Curated annotation (Swiss-Prot):
It comes from the Bacteria. Zn(2+) 2 binds at residues 61-62, 158, 199. Its cofactor is Zn(2+). InterPro entries: MBL_Glyoxalase_II, Metallo-B-lactamas, RibonucZ/Hydroxyglut_hydro. The keyword Transcription does not apply. The keyword Metal-binding applies. One of its GO terms (molecular function) is hydrolase activity. It comes from Mycobacterium leprae (strain TN). This is Uncharacterized protein ML0493. Its EC number is 3.-.-.-. Belongs to the metallo-beta-lactamase superfamily. Glyoxalase II family. Keywords: Hydrolase, Metal-binding, Zinc. It is an enzyme of class 3 (hydrolase). Binds 2 Zn(2+) ions per subunit.
């Protein structure tokens, strides 16, 4: 499987591109600020055609370029219904600091939006099959995407990071829900599963089970 990514924009959100191989359909996850340029290069170099934009949640650093990518390539954007309102209001509850940075930015929904309204759903997106788990805690509509490959991969957004977990002090956040999501949806995965988080370095489920101080005793 072809998996690559890059940190996008000021807030350094990891944008990922997944495909079975070069020359096939591709899935784009969390295209943040100024993602179009790097995405075009990756798609062109690997002869990839986007089949979907997947959003782990609706915060601005993860969805900034979703509408542009989706409408440019004519593919749908997938988001949980609890976070759909953030496609047009991604700063809701995000705090004044970020609002000042993006003053004047205008957001609208992509022409094609698909709601991820079924927990445990399986999406067949061209060459890639993605399993969707609703993992509220960081936001009410946060989801994780699990992909079976030679080594399984889970894209965790802002739910789980290397040696830390997602913040829960923004609108819709819940510490109780976050821990339940991690325990019931992530720690049940094989230790070798590669974790691709929304920010920072990749890790594995096993490494976080052993070394993440926020998961001690779980």
């Amino acid at each position: 499987m072809l998996i690559t990514g890059f940190p996008a924009g000021m807030l350094q959100c990891n944008c990922y591109v997944l495909a079975d191989r070069a020359g096939t359909d591709a899935v784009i996850v969390d295209p943040g600020q100024r993602a179009m340029g790097p995405l075009r290069r990756i798609l062109d170099e690997n002869r990839l055609t986007p089949s979907a934009v997947l959003l782990t949640h609706g915060h601005i650093d993860h969805m900034w370029s979703a509408q542009k990518v989706s409408d440019t390539y004519g593919c749908p954007t997938y988001i949980h219904p609890e976070d759909r309102f953030m496609l047009t209001d991604p700063l809701f509850g995000f705090g004044p600091r970020v609002a000042q940075v993006v003053t004047g930015a205008f957001f609208r929904e992509p022409k094609q939006v698909v709601e991820l309204d079924r927990d445990g759903d399986k999406l067949d997106l061209g060459s890639v099959t993605v399993n969707v788990d609703h993992t509220p805690g960081h936001t009410r509509g946060s989801v994780c995407f699990w992909v079976a490959a030679d080594t399984d991969v889970v894209l965790t957004g802002d739910t789980l990071f290397e040696r830390t977990i997602g913040r829960t002090d923004l609108f819709g956040g819940s510490g109780r829900d976050l821990y339940r999501s991690i325990v019931e949806k992530l720690l049940v995965l094989d230790d070798k599963t590669v974790v691709l988080p929304g920010h920072g370095n990749s890790t594995t489920i096993g490494a976080e089970r052993r070394f993440n101080p926020f998961l001690e005793g779980l």
